C-alpha cells in the first residue's frame, strides 16, 4: 500500500483551493491568513483529513486534538457536499492570572468534500475518539443489471 500524499489540484471531489507556493519555506504566495511562522495555528486551521473508500463506505478521518464533540460540526450541503468544521476558542484570560507561555493554538477550520454519486448522505454517521473524528458515508448497493431471457423460436 502506498501512502503518497496527494495534491488536491486534480481531485474532482476536493473543494480546497490550490496554493502553488504550498510547501515552500518562505510562506504562501496567496496571502494565507495563517503564516508559516505560526505552524501550530496553521496546522489546526488546515485540519488534515484522510479520505478512504472501502467496498461499503467512504470514510473520513480528521485529527482534531483537544476539541470536544460540541466544538465540531459535520454537515451535508446541497445533498452531496460533506462539510466538516470546528473551532477552538482561546482560553479566557483573568486579570489576576499571570501567563508565562501560551502555545496552544486557537482558531477555526472548515473543509468541504464533494461526495460521489454512489453515496447515501442521509445515512452519514460520525464519531470522535482520542482526538480523531471519523465520518462514515455509506455507499449504495451496486445496481444489478436486469437480465431478460429472450425465447428463441424456430
Curated annotation (Swiss-Prot):
Main location: cytoplasm
Localization per record: Cytoplasm
This protein's record includes keyword GTP-binding: no
UniProt domain sHSP: residue ranges: 40-154
Listed InterPro entries: A-crystallin/Hsp20_dom, CS_dom, HSP20-like_chaperone, Small_HSP
Pfam family, one: HSP20
One Gene Ontology term, aspect cellular component: cytoplasm
Entry's Gene Ontology BP terms: protein complex oligomerization; protein folding; response to arsenic-containing substance; response to cadmium ion; response to copper ion; response to ethanol; response to heat; response to hydrogen peroxide
KW Glycosyltransferase (keyword) present: no
Disulfide bonds: none
UniProt keyword terms in alphabetical order: Cytoplasm, Stress response
GO molecular function ontology, one term from the record: unfolded protein binding
Gene induction: By heat shock, arsenic, azetidine-2-carboxylate, cadmium, copper, ethanol and hydrogen peroxide.
Family to which this protein belongs: Belongs to the small heat shock protein (HSP20) family.
Assembly mode: May form oligomeric structures.
Name the record gives this protein: 17.4 kDa class I heat shock protein
Amino acid at each position: 500500500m502506498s501512502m503518497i500524499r496527494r495534491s488536491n489540484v486534480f481531485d474532482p471531489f476536493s473543494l480546497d483551493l490550490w496554493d502553488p507556493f504550498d510547501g515552500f519555506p518562505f510562506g504562501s504566495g496567496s496571502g494565507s491568513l495563517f503564516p508559516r511562522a505560526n505552524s501550530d495555528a496553521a496546522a489546526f486551521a488546515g485540519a488534515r483529513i484522510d479520505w478512504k473508500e472501502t467496498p461499503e463506505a467512504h470514510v473520513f478521518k480528521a485529527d482534531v486534538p483537544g476539541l470536544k464533540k460540541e466544538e465540531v460540526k459535520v454537515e451535508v450541503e446541497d445533498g452531496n457536499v460533506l462539510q466538516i468544521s470546528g473551532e477552538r476558542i482561546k482560553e479566557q484570560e483573568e486579570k489576576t492570572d499571570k501567563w508565562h507561555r501560551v502555545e496552544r493554538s486557537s482558531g477555526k477550520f472548515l473543509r468541504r468534500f464533494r461526495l460521489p454519486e454512489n453515496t447515501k448522505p442521509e445515512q452519514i454517521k460520525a464519531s470522535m475518539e482520542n482526538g480523531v473524528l471519523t465520518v462514515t458515508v455509506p455507499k449504495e448497493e451496486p445496481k444489478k443489471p436486469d437480465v431478460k431471457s429472450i425465447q428463441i423460436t424456430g
